Amino acid sequence: MKLQNSRLSHRFNIIWLLLCLLLSSSITIAGEWEQVTTALQDGKANAVRNLSNQERTILQATVALKIDKPDQALMLLASAKHAKDPLVDLLEAEAHRQQAIHAMKQAGGMERQEKLLASADLNDGLGEADARLRAFMDRLNKQEGDPVDILMAGPNVASVFMFDKARNRMFVYEPTRNGGLKQITDEYVVTGTVIGDKQRRGDGRTPHGVYRFVKKLQGKNLESRYGPVAFPIDYPNELDAFHKKDGSGIWLHGYPLDVSRRPPQDTRGCFSLSNDRLLTMARYVKLRHSWVIVGENFVFDHSNRKSKLLSSVKRDIEAWRRDWVSLDTEAYLSHYHRKFRSGKRDLAAWKRYKRRVNANKSFVKVGFTNMTLIHDPNTWPEGEVVVAEFDQSYRSSNYADKERKRVYLARANADQSWKILLEESLKQ
């Protein structure tokens, strides 16, 4: 009997704990919506002042629908109907759906019809409203700080475009003269119809990684469905090719000329902005000097995480350079990853090549300048990856040259040193 009572008491405690957790979660969510509603109504927060009247109304109506107040949503949307906005029409349809469900519940005896209405899925169309609301809430509770992944922007970096697929947001930054970063924009962007990292041609996914804009398409070179202008990126890059990812034609482009709204996942793998915003942002694109970072849930902070990461990368690059000029070939080769490739050479071929070359030298001098360091926000099979690009000056007892170089450094965890996974010389 005591054992049975103990078990019953234990079950009761678990049920009570679950109820408390559910109650506390619902209170937190209710408080969150109340904060958003208040901010949108009083208009004092910077996140609200930067909104157009139309966007503000759409956000207010979206919140009203989230808290099951369709009548309030319809009142708000009535003031936005003049703009002929398809997103307003979709929100209005959702409000009428909620109203109909409420009416059937009050009438009673219509469970089957109520279930049919409840199962009607408007999420594809309303995805843009949800994404915009999430972005607004992020800005309302803004986490201060720079993006961790832009470790160091060299003097030849014009801008960095960051595409956060999880948030459907595009952040754009410009380097400042004092080595900092200035945020140019934070806005809604459309990505591929299929969730996840691109692997194959035609899979509908947007690739994860670090890229550059390399071309500009417009006029007769661009179909009208892509908007007024498009900027292809250099996908697939060396890291993609190393992992046998294929496909091509990943662009930043606009909307079809007769479209003003698009759901969050609605392209064949590209990034898409509304045409007016695309034209505004086009002035910040400088081919081969505008970097592109694609990932999910970027981290922004003022903590020492970024400085620690930067220090570790700079330390290991300098150790590589130092061992190179020492002509201690084995120490120099210890900085290369076991999966290393450069062109057609794997690590074994690279070792044979470098041992042969260094055997005929009495001195080597190497310098790195104009360096850019970008941390890839995505985890690769080799672990964490950083892309380093720099001008390399090389002089030895029998050879000298200068070239632009890009290396991909990898480490399995934070306790390990960075190793060179890929090394390539770039065309000037």
What are the residue ranges of the model-derived segments?
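Bacterial N-terminal signal peptides
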Residues: I15-S25
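Alpha-helical protein-protein interaction scaffolds
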Residues: E32-A129
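Exported/periplasmic cell-wall-interacting domains
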Residues: A95, K215-E318
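Gly/Pro-biased beta-strand-loop elements
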Residues: D138-I250, P256, S260
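Short, aromatic-enriched amphipathic alpha-helices that serve as compact interaction elements
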Residues: L309-D328, H335
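Short, solvent-exposed secondary-structure junction/capping segments
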Residues: L333-R345
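Surface-exposed, charged secondary-structure patches
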Residues: R355-R406
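Short beta-strand edge/turn micro-motifs at domain boundaries
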Residues: Y399-Q428
